[in-house]
UniProtKB/Swiss-Prot annotation:
Pfam hit, one: CitX
Annotated spans, Apo-citrate lyase phosphoribosyl-dephospho-CoA transferase: 1-178
Cell cycle as UniProt keyword: no
Keyword Signal attached: no
Region of interest (2-(5''-triphosphoribosyl)-3'-dephosphocoenzyme-A synthase), ranges: 179-462
Organism the protein comes from: Weissella paramesenteroides (Leuconostoc paramesenteroides)
A molecular function (GO) term: ATP binding
Family, as annotated: In the N-terminal section; belongs to the CitX family.
InterPro entries per UniProt: CitG (IPR002736), CitX (IPR005551), TriPribosyl-deP-CoA_syn_CitG (IPR017551)
Protein name: Protein CitXG
Its EC number(s): 2.7.7.61, 2.4.2.52
Bridged cysteine pairs (disulfide): none
Alphabetical keyword list: ATP-binding, Multifunctional enzyme, Nucleotide-binding, Nucleotidyltransferase, Plasmid, Transferase
GO biological process, one term: prosthetic group biosynthetic process
Length: 462
């Protein structure tokens, strides 16, 4: 079913009349609220169907998300579902006009259905009233269909209405789908996508303190070529992980994990042989191996939901914290030391809980992103870094207090527009230099990004 199967068609004259009505109301609000900023919002929907129950819900959900970022004592008036041309809303707020415009643009570009919104920000008497997207560090608004500047496509009439409807329907279905589905795939498909996760991560630039194509980051014993060698050396391990999951017949999935872990020990040695004893992917061997095995097991008889895969993972690693961390043995790894010192469970805690940092944070965030592959992955990495108790970061900082700093750094990054603005990217380069100076690294976040890329590739999010 299409969003546009229901609703009353409107003609061009009705649309033009509504434009005049909106302009008069905006002017009135600017006069009666001369010391405030006026924001108006509507949906940018092509064709004659501009209002129905689904479009109203899209608008209300997005509008509520948008206004939640402003002071709760702001006055606002809403006109919703009354006009045949679609729902509209108006709000007056205090603040700096340029900052509010940036907030509106970021909403349009980062909210799952934000690109369907048209938000105008205006005020009397502020010098930056005429600031454009480009003046604020953003690129031009892009066409939903082809990604070229929207003004060019509109002027040249490059696309049909049916093409526009198809893309909007796909966006809506993607944003409202309740859960990711893993289809039954071949060993080659699953393993190749796992390798993509490893290779895409190291190819991404810039990343705070991490190895990338132009920098060793804070890892002076590593470079990108070493990561490529390491990634390729793990193909045999990933093949075995898939076979273990697809062929396992028992009911005690802890036995499946034990078999995987034995292969993981061998894979670590293979990695060290490929990297001259540098630890490039020890964390990924653990986490990526678990996911490959769990997906292969869960989909042996057909498709599986994210929830089903997570339950398999939890059954595989049941009792892992007690076995690895709660014993009285001498701590030999950063994760074990941090559990004994700070009671942080690290990657084992993530695994025991079914990797909530992946399935509840990183993947949903990735699903809502847009732009180039680099932009989407950089923003996703920083979202991960904002929420993860990164054992690599804690180890290098020698204190978990660095996690609060990380939250602040990522908050500044996103307030500046993230990967979609020059200011955001400059900040990320500056942050990379700061990490190198302080010998910090978000290695745990990188491992989580690898998993997210793998899942994104396998399910069609990327």
């Amino acid at each position: 079913m299409s969003i546009f199967d229901i609703g009353e068609a409107v003609d061009l004259l009705t649309v033009l009349d509504n434009r005049e009505w909106r302009s008069r109301l905006q002017d009135k609000l600017k006069v009666t609220n001369s010391d405030k900023i006026v924001i108006s919002a509507k949906l940018n929907i092509p064709g004659p169907i501009k209002n129905n129950d689904i479009l109203q819900k899209i608008f209300m959900d997005g509008w509520q998300t948008f206004v939640a970022g402003f002071e709760c004592n702001s006055q606002y008036e809403m006109l919703f579902a009354e006009r045949a041309t679609g729902p509209e809303a108006f709000i007056t707020v205090d603040g700096n006009l340029a900052a509010v415009k940036k907030t509106a643009i970021l909403f349009e570009e980062t909210y799952a259905l934000g690109r369907l919104f048209d938000i105008d920000v205006m005020a009397n008497g502020q010098a930056d009233y005429q600031l454009s997207r480009e003046d604020l560090g953003f690129g031009p608004r892009l066409c939903l269909i082809c990604g070229k500047p929207a003004k060019v496509c509109a002027k040249e009439q490059n696309h049909t209405l049916d093409e526009g409807y198809e893309v909007i329907n796909q966006m809506y279905q993607g944003a409202t789908s309740k859960e990711l589905i893993f289809e039954k795939e071949s060993q080659e498909t699953v393993v190749n996508n796992a390798l993509k996760g490893l290779l895409y991560e190291v190819s991404l630039n810039p990343k705070p303190g991490l190895v990338d194509p132009v920098s060793m980051g804070s890892h002076t014993d590593m470079n990108m070529f070493m990561f490529i060698d390491s990634s390729l050396s793990l193909k045999s391990y990933l093949d075995k992980a898939f076979k273990l999951g697809r062929n396992f017949e028992g009911s005690d999935l802890k036995l499946l994990f034990n078999a995987l872990r034995a292969e993981g020990v061998l894979a670590e040695q293979t990695m060290f042989n490929a990297t001259n004893n540098a630890n490039t992917h020890k964390g990924a061997i653990f986490s990526l191996g678990i996911w490959v095995t769990a997906i292969a097991y869960s989909t042996k008889d057909g498709s599986a939901t994210m929830t089903e895969v997570r339950r398999v993972i939890q059954r595989m690693v049941e009792g892992l914290i007690e076995k690895d961390l709660a014993s009285n043995r001498v701590a030999t790894t950063a994760g074990e030391q941090q559990f004994q010192t700070y009671q942080l469970t690290g990657i084992r805690g993530e695994a025991v809980n079914g990797f909530p940092g992946v399935s509840e944070v990183a993947v949903p965030f990735l699903q809502a992103t847009f732009g180039t592959m680099t932009q989407r992955l950089l923003d996703t990495l920083m979202k991960i870094a904002a929420t993860l108790e990164d054992s690599t970061l804690i180890k290098r900082a020698k204190t978990p207090d660095v996690l609060a700093e990380m939250k602040e750094w990522t908050s500044i990054y996103f307030k500046l527009g993230g990967s979609h603005t020059e200011q955001g990217m400059k900040y990320l380069y500056d942050l990379d230099r700061l990490f190198i100076e302080r010998n910090l690294s978000i290695g745990g976040s990188a491992d989580t990004l690898i998993l997210t890329i793998f899942i994104g590739q396998l399910t069609g999010l990327l």
